[in-house]
Regions:
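Conserved hydrophobic/aromatic beta-strand scaffold that supports enzyme active sites
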Residues: 139, 363-367
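Short amphipathic alpha-helix with an adjacent loop that forms part of the alpha/beta core around
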Residues: 79-83, 288-294
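Hydrophobic beta-strand segment of the Class I
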Residues: 92, 298-299
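Basic Arg/Gly/Lys-rich low-complexity intrinsically disordered segments
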Residues: 367-399
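SAM-dependent Rossmann-like transferase core, predominantly class I methyltransferases
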Residues: 150-184
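Accessory substrate-recognition/RNA-binding modules or partner subunits associated with SAM-dependent
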Residues: 2-136, 146, 154-155, 160, ...
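Conserved S-adenosyl-L-methionine
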Residues: 173-291, 306, 314-316
Length: 399
């Protein structure tokens, strides 16, 4: 079985690594996607376990098409009862790169017409359309050479919908992007993890699921459960195996935010994900926060001043850089920002720059190596002001 796994720009490599770990074959990174091959068990495991995939599509058939009418007639020849039953709802997502098919909505409508007309002809009745929450979702793609590909969506809701988000806050980070950032940073749970601008807690939760070996899809359902070839015994066995793979916390995962509402949302999301034993959150400014001793990993997504109002965005980034230099000795710090001018005010030279997209915003994901030599020391090599101050660690209680 061939699979096409969609992802975000910049995450193709880490997604390919995930698929390899799951046992996929013939893995090929593409633009915002990775293709591979595997059996039904791989399809189920991939939906359950992938952290950096958005949705998993199964190619069904393809054909050359020259016009809308030819598309309709070709689709009328398909036995749609193999994929859809009369009592089920369905939806069509259409996308075209062909100069002959410029209107995606019209393509979706034409495809829908062909399907319902086939059912009327064969059964005298037709299934209903549900664009928001269908039982079966089809994808039609027409490339620049007018090759039409028809695919079944095995995921249903996008895989970023983990099932733990109670509410997102002002500008929530996409779960797939958050997991991808952690994968790109190379954090594996063997060091403290800190987000000093944690917002609704997405990075913290994704980090906890990684270190706890908890599948991100454990709290939700999938479209393949509505397919006619759904193997309930196989699926229940895979879920049972996944539940038994959970690991206890290894290192502290700590989030800080100065906004009371953000901390409450983060606490609710953490509770919904059942990860209270993995994560500590604290209401504090990042200027006052003291992390566990390094080595450690910090990943934060500071405001861009594009959707969130800040009084002085350049000053904010300078303060972030100052705090990193002062208190995060031995850490690898990663910052994602869509404000490239403000990012320059961090005042540190990035050792790595990765281009990512946060929604429609072009961002850079910068890595900063915070060596001990960059920190002002006293006679014994210790920051004199921080010598006697307590640091938030695994045993600390959240505020």
């Amino acid at each position: 079985m061939k699979l096409l796994v969609k992802t975000l720009a910049g995450l193709e490599g880490v997604l390919a690594d995930e698929l390899q770990q799951l046992g996929a074959q013939n893995i090929e990174p593409l633009k915002r996607a990775v293709s591979c091959e595997g059996d039904l068990a791989l399809l189920y495991r991939a939906n359950l376990w992938l952290r950096c995939g958005i949705r998993i599509l199964v190619p069904v058939f393809d054909f050359q098409v020259e016009s809308e009418e030819e598309l309709y007639q070709q689709l009328r020849t398909i036995d749609w009862s193999k994929y859809l039953q009369l009592h089920q709802t369905f939806a069509i997502d259409a996308n075209s790169q062909s100069s002959r098919f410029r209107h995606n909505r019209f393509l979706a409508q034409k495809t829908k017409d062909a399907i319902v007309d086939w059912f009327r002809e064969q059964h005298g009745r037709r299934p209903s359309v549900n664009p928001k929450s269908p039982d079966i979702r089809f994808h039609l793609h027409i490339d620049s050479r007018h090759q039409a590909s028809f695919l079944l969506d095995s995921s249903g809701d996008g895989l970023h919908r983990r099932g733990y988000r109670t509410t997102g806050g002002a500008a929530p980070l996409n779960e797939v992007l958050a997991a991808g950032m952690i994968r790109l940073a190379g954090w594996k749970g063997d060091q403290p993890f800190v987000d000093m601008l944690c917002g609704s807690g997405t990075l913290l939760i994704e980090a906890a699921m990684i270190t706890g070996n908890i599948p991100p899809g454990l709290l939700r359902s999938f479209a393949f459960q509505n397919w006619q070839n759904f193997d309930a015994d196989l699926w229940h066995g895979i879920k049972s195996e996944a539940r038994q793979s959970k690991r206890p916390p290894q290192q502290p995962i700590i989030g800080v935010d100065n906004h009371f509402k953000a901390i409450r949302i983060a606490e609710n999301n953490i509770a919904a994900a059942k990860l209270q034993s993995y994560i500590r959150v604290k209401r504090s400014t990042f200027q006052q926060f003291l992390p566990p001793e390094g080595p450690g990993t910090l990943i934060s997504n500071p405001p861009y001043d594009l959707r969130l109002e800040t009084r002085d965005i350049n000053g904010l980034y300078k303060e972030i850089g100052d705090r990193l230099k002062k208190e995060f000795t031995g850490y690898q710090a990663w910052l994602l920002s869509g404000n490239l001018e403000a990012l320059k005010n961090v005042g540190l030279r990035p050792s790595r720059r990765i281009h990512l997209l946060n929604g429609q915003i072009a961002c850079k994901f910068h890595k900063y190596e915070l060596y001990s030599g960059s920190k002002k020391k006293g006679k014994e090599g210790v920051d004199e002001k921080a010598r006697n101050r307590p640091r938030l660690g695994r045993g600390s209680r959240p505020a």
